[in-house]
């Protein structure tokens, strides 16, 4: 989440953008679904907390929106990417950087009924509200000219 006060006053206090952000492990992620025709919100779905730098793609198929993103369990990756931390050796037995998890969220369009009511995403038999596609990818690249907003492999 963003602390607006810190964002507005960062120049006075010489603080970086990471100080505008704060992590709340109890705060659910919200997916706001917007109608492409009129720009109105038509629904809100929630998921377990995660931190994301980069979205890969989103597309609609079979009455669902599929959203793929590179996700972290929390925002600790921000400080891990500081130059001083990247230049220093990792402690024995400690990982230097968190590994991203490429996740696919399936948002059921058939369950849109109230733009102001938050509805949790369905959880699978594994208890997760997403599918894990792979790990270790950041700065993803797909053929955007051909597949942006469309299904892909």
Language-model region placement:
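Beta-propeller domains
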Residues: 1-153
């Amino acid at each position: 989440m963003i602390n607006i006060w810190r964002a507005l006053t960062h120049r006075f206090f010489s603080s970086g953008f990471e100080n505008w952000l704060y992590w709340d492990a109890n705060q659910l992620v919200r997916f706001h679904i917007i109608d492409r025709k009129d720009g109105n919100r038509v629904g809100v779905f929630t998921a377990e907390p995660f931190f994301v730098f980069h979205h890969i793609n989103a597309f609609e198929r079979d009455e669902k929106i599929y959203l793929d993103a590179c996700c972290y369990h929390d925002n600790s990756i921000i400080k891990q990417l500081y130059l001083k931390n990247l230049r220093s050796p990792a402690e024995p037995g400690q990982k230097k950087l968190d590994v991203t998890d490429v996740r696919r969220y399936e948002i059921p369009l058939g369950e849109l009924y109230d733009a102001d009511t938050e509805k949790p995403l369905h959880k699978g038999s594994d208890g997760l509200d997403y599918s894990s596609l792979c790990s270790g990818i950041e700065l993803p690249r797909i053929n955007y000219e051909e597949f942006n907003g469309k299904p892909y492999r």
